[in-house]
């Protein structure tokens, strides 16, 4: 049980550590920089059909160009969202990216009369600086998830132990194990 707890904790910390979050507007190209190389970087997209899908040799559903180190995503669409992992075959160097595809927002240019009236209203308006509550860092979410898992596992272990103890030792009565399960 301790091994399972350690495995879950290590996987959560590993997923949160070293990951670069990239937001790319629809229709743009973007280059993911690979790790320092000794031979050639292999790029995979996690969560695709083959789970670890080597993407430099494929043409569908995403179109990319690969050189020895970097991966360029071409004409980005929603299909490109996901985790990209680039690693050097002969060393332990790797880079981890979380790609998020965003809608590009277009706005109309205001005329000069609107700008002047906005300048006057800005002089009278004072705002307090508050942090953006909708933007929670991924590392904080990973830490909270790890704490919740670590707190839940001992409770689950105690319940399982109590059930198994009662099943195999029905004649022994312990005050702590008087569960009606």
UniProtKB/Swiss-Prot annotation:
Highest taxon, organism lineage: Viruses
Glycan-carrying positions: 29, 57, 70, 75
InterPro entries, per database record: Adeno_E3_CR1 (IPR003471), Adeno_E3_CR2 (IPR003470)
Assigned keywords, A-Z: Early protein, Glycoprotein
Cited Pfam families: Adeno_E3_CR1 (PF02440), Adeno_E3_CR2 (PF02439)
Functional note: E3 proteins seem to be dispensable for virus growth in tissue culture cells. They are potentially important for virus growth under special conditions; E3 region may help adenoviruses to evade the immune surveillance of the host.
Protein family according to the UniProt entry: Belongs to the adenoviridae E3_20 family.
UniProt-recorded name of the protein: Early E3 20.3 kDa glycoprotein
Annotated source species: Human adenovirus B serotype 11 (strain BC34) (HAdV-11)
């Amino acid at each position: 049980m301790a091994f399972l707890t350690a495995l879950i904790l290590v996987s959560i910390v590993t997923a949160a550590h070293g990951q670069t979050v990239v937001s790319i507007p629809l229709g743009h190209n973007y280059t993911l920089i690979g790790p320092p190389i000794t031979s050639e970087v292999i790029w995979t997209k996690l969560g695709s059909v083959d789970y670890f899908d080597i993407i430099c040799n494929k043409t569908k559903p995403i179109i990319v160009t690969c050189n020895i180190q970097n991966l360029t995503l071409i004409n980005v669409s929603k299909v490109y969202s996901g985790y990209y992992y680039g690693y050097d075959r002969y060393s332990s160097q790797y880079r981890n990216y979380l790609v998020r595809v965003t809608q590009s927002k277009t706005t109309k240019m205001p005329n000069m009369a609107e700008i002047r009236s906005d300048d006057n209203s800005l002089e009278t308006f004072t705002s307090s600086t508050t942090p953006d509550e909708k933007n929670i860092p991924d590392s904080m979410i990973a830490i909270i998830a790890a704490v919740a898992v670590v707190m839940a596992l001992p409770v689950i272990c105690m319940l399982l132990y109590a059930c198994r103890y009662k099943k195999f030792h029905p004649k022994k009565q312990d005050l702590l194990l008087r569960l009606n399960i």
